[in-house]
């Protein structure tokens, strides 16, 4: 299902397990912005009255590794509760993101993960993604 603004607060604690560096209020704000923007979407799945998974996707107009077109649909994050992994629900969420991207005019869909996140790498490869590059990012304070 496509998440609505009223779902942001209920989704935030689960999404915090994906991005623990963010506080809950920041995640509610991020989710609310993603839900409201025509350039992004949040899809979620429930079991009974609890959310068990969520996927955040957006349109990227900048360069995306390995892609030749613009905009590119981009999976910013996907999370499934432990007891719902390997059930096909994440595949369904990804499919909803991909369909949304097609409807937005995209011909390519991309994602990323940390170099050390072997679980995410296996997930992406199992769902038809191909690895395009490995990078280490740098910064310095000016």
Regions found by a protein language model. Name each.
Residues 94, 101-113:
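Conserved GNAT acetyl-CoA-binding A-motif
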Residues 23-46, 56:
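Active-site rim helix/loop that mediates acceptor-substrate recognition in acyltransferases
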Residues 12-26:
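Helix-loop element at the rim of GNAT/NAT acetyltransferase active sites that forms part
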Residues 110-120, 139:
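Conserved beta-strand-loop-alpha-helix junction that forms the acyl-donor binding cleft
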Residues 80, 86-99, 122-126:
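Conserved acetyl-CoA-binding loop-helix of GNAT-fold acetyltransferases
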Residues 44, 50-59, 74, 79:
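Conserved beta-strand in the GNAT
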Residues 1-11:
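A short beta-loop-alpha structural element at the N-terminal edge
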Residues 68-82, 136-137:
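Conserved acetyl-CoA binding element of GNAT-fold acetyltransferases
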């Amino acid at each position: 299902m496509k998440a609505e603004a009223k779902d942001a607060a209920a989704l935030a604690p689960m999404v915090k397990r994906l991005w623990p560096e963010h506080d809950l209020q920041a995640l509610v704000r991020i989710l609310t912005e993603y839900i409201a923007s025509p350039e992004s979407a949040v899809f979620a799945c429930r079991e009974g009255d609890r959310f068990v998974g969520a996927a955040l996707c957006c349109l990227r107009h900048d360069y995306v590794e390995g892609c030749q077109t613009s905009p590119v649909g981009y999976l910013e994050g996907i999370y499934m509760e432990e007891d719902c992994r390997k059930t096909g629900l994440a595949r369904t969420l990804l499919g909803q993101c991909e369909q949304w991207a097609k409807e937005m005019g995209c011909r390519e869909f991309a994602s990323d993960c940390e170099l050390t996140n072997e679980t995410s790498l296996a997930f992406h490869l199992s769902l038809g993604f191909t690895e395009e590059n490995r990078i280490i990012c740098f910064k310095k304070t000016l």
